[in-house]
């Protein structure tokens, strides 16, 4: 029911109509990948493309380059992607899902590794519209569902590999979320997940009061030991830490494409090791878990 409502709102959105008009031009596009997702069209529709991209702000994940238009997104998402890149051979010829896929940046980057099928899940009309704009030019076979992680158990496909990046701390029941991920896997499936974490040897989690780094919907920020316990309780048998990284102002910063504050405004101005609320500053752990 929720999917149908979102899909209806999406299809009736005025920007969807504009993107469809752009798609109808059937522009020739050269699609390439480096740190950016690059689209070269040499088209006469540059003004229309610029207008749509401006209406679709904020752009969080990226960057993207469309001809001479550079969408300098809040996050330099290639930094996260490059942490996971050594493991991307695992998606070759596999059925892959990206949960919380935002505008699809990571999925576009994954195409280089030849997945058999690539499906993104995110119940956000704005991010879906951003994806549709990019894909109207790139013309990739990526599929985007206006669904959340809770829809995985009943989804029509199971997946060999699931990416779930920057989602679990937004969930009020992280073990339930992990169970939903597990239910979406094929036999011998694998999940790549990242989360903010706290430095502590104990099996505990930070429960922020109201906000964490000025973000209101952060429920739990676990220690790595607590995260491991969550995964075991959800039924995962293998837990491997791939990397840890502190979030810095090179990776996340304010640009003209977000019209709001960013990391520099979320940290204690006197001590960048603390958030504005006095918690540990954000850092992330990347894990691989298997059933």
Swiss-Prot record:
The keyword tRNA processing applies. It comes from the Bacteria. GO terms for biological process: tRNA wobble uridine modification. One of its GO terms (molecular function) is transferase activity, transferring alkyl or aryl (other than methyl) groups. Catalyzes carboxymethyl transfer from carboxy-S-adenosyl-L-methionine (Cx-SAM) to 5-hydroxyuridine (ho5U) to form 5-carboxymethoxyuridine (cmo5U) at position 34 in tRNAs. Keywords: Transferase, tRNA processing. Homotetramer. Its EC number is 2.5.1.-. It catalyses: carboxy-S-adenosyl-L-methionine + 5-hydroxyuridine(34) in tRNA = 5-carboxymethoxyuridine(34) in tRNA + S-adenosyl-L-homocysteine + H(+). NCBIfam families: PRK15068.1 (NF011650), tRNA 5-methoxyuridine(34)/uridine 5-oxyacetic acid(34) synthase CmoB (TIGR00452). It comes from Campylobacter jejuni subsp. jejuni serotype O:23/36 (strain 81-176). Carboxy-S-adenosyl-L-methionine binds at residues 61, 75, 80, 100, 122-124, 149-150, 169, 284. HAMAP family: tRNA_carboxymethyltr_CmoB. It holds the Pfam family Methyltransf_9. Belongs to the class I-like SAM-binding methyltransferase superfamily. CmoB family. This is tRNA U34 carboxymethyltransferase. The keyword Hydrolase does not apply.
